[in-house]
Amino acid sequence: MNAVILIPARLDSSRLPRKMLADLEGEPLIVRTWRQALRSNLASRVVVAADSPEIAAVLEPLGAEVVLTSPTASCGTERIAEAARSIEADVFLNLQGDEPLISPENIDLALQPFFDAPAGSALPDCTTLVFPLGPDDRTQIDDPHVVKVVMDGEGNALYFSRSPIPYVRNSSPSLRLYRHVGLYAFTAEVLQRFAAMPVSMLEEAESLEQLRLLESGFRIRCVNTAVDNPGVNTPEDLELVRSLLRRASRA
């Protein structure tokens, strides 16, 4: 099984422009994400799929492999699919470029189901990670930047939403709430099929690319993780990550 990590990196984010180059205690954000990806035990290669030579300019002197992709990709998965066409692999993991604190263990958790599949059996279409939320975690439950997920009895995603799901009319001791941890692993075939499909209705409504797969009948297997690392979507997130890095450097 050959697994490759692809990191989509777009320079002009709408919520935090040029965040890939934002300074995080002496290193650009994208460099820190790339360094964390290199620590995976299961991936054989890490490639950054960038839309700007400026991103390549900070990575390539460090030895990073960078593929320049079209600036017109509608989402990160389309960007990595473009890069993947020139790379031989069985599985591709989409690690968002704005995850500078991503745990290497989380990367390997998403990849492990592909390695565990018995010889000759079907591989998962796609895997991702989920993190449990408590019923009192209202800040995250109500935050549209925090994506929530509900699953079937076998751990396959039923739906992802920026809204609180499920709607809790009657609480139950067995009710479990989860947030989505935004990395995905795909077979090479499913990744290219995703990129060939048009943007779906629910994907456009929620601005969540994974809904394109669900609407087309693919299964997304959700793997539980106990490690939740903050990504960077807003200026407030950026300051939080900076403070965490400063704290870690003093430890």
UniProtKB/Swiss-Prot annotation:
Please tell me the species this chain comes from.
Chlorobium luteolum (strain DSM 273 / BCRC 81028 / 2530) (Pelodictyon luteolum)
Q: What does this protein do?
A: Activates KDO (a required 8-carbon sugar) for incorporation into bacterial lipopolysaccharide in Gram-negative bacteria.
Name the UniProt key words of this record, in alphabetical order.
Answer: Cytoplasm, Lipopolysaccharide biosynthesis, Nucleotidyltransferase, Transferase
Which HAMAP family would you find in this protein's record? KdsB
Q: Where does it primarily localize?
A: cytoplasm
Question: Annotated Gene Ontology MF terms?
Answer: 3-deoxy-manno-octulosonate cytidylyltransferase activity
**In Gene Ontology terms, what is a biological process of this protein?**
lipopolysaccharide biosynthetic process
UniProt protein name:
3-deoxy-manno-octulosonate cytidylyltransferase
Lineage of source species: Bacteria, Pseudomonadati, Chlorobiota, Chlorobiia, Chlorobiales
Q: For this protein, what reaction is catalysed?
A: 3-deoxy-alpha-D-manno-oct-2-ulosonate + CTP = CMP-3-deoxy-beta-D-manno-octulosonate + diphosphate
Q: Which PANTHER family match?
A: 3-DEOXY-MANNO-OCTULOSONATE CYTIDYLYLTRANSFERASE (PTHR42866), 3-DEOXY-MANNO-OCTULOSONATE CYTIDYLYLTRANSFERASE, MITOCHONDRIAL (PTHR42866:SF2)
Enzyme Commission no: 2.7.7.38
